[in-house]
């Protein structure tokens, strides 16, 4: 049954690399939306590191703080190298549809096409998701992505 959910992908990379991954994510979602019901409607936002992880929440955690392990991972994998213009961002993807696990796996493969590789990923990444499993998260999803449901119900 279709419902609202949110996929989150933290990235630590140069602007060109994170923009490329963002474009690939949009293409993936477009492809899936043409093959409904997996993705009936979606919205993607690129959130800078200085923004809160959950707007309006009492939590004061920023996106950079949430993904603080990503710059550290990069430094460990590139000892002595300068990070240049790398920064932490989060791709926040609201979805009205089904297939959370499939989408999360495919999103992960955009950043890391070969999960069993022995070298470091060019752009360190981390994924997570939000489901409407209680009143708090259902309200969060409705407030941010309820318009996706309304688009499809009209």
Regions found by a protein language model. Give the residues of each.
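Long, contiguous binding/interaction regions
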Residues: 1-154
């Amino acid at each position: 049954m279709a419902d609202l959910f949110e996929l989150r992908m933290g990235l630590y990379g140069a602007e060109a690399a994170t923009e490329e991954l963002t474009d690939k994510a949009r293409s993936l979602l477009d492809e899936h939306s043409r093959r409904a019901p997996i993705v009936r409607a979606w919205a993607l936002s690129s959130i800078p590191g200085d923004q809160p992880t959950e707007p309006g929440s009492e939590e004061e955690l920023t996106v950079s703080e949430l993904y603080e392990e990503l710059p550290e991972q990069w430094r460990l994998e590139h000892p002595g190298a300068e990070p240049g213009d790398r920064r932490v961002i989060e791709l926040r993807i609201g979805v009205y549809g089904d297939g959370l696990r499939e989408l999360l796996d495919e999103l992960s493969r955009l950043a890391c096409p070969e999960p069993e590789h022995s070298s470091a990923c060019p752009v360190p990444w981390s994924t997570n998701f939000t489901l409407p499993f209680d009143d708090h998260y259902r309200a969060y999803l409705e407030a941010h992505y309820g318009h996706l449901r309304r688009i499809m119900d009209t």
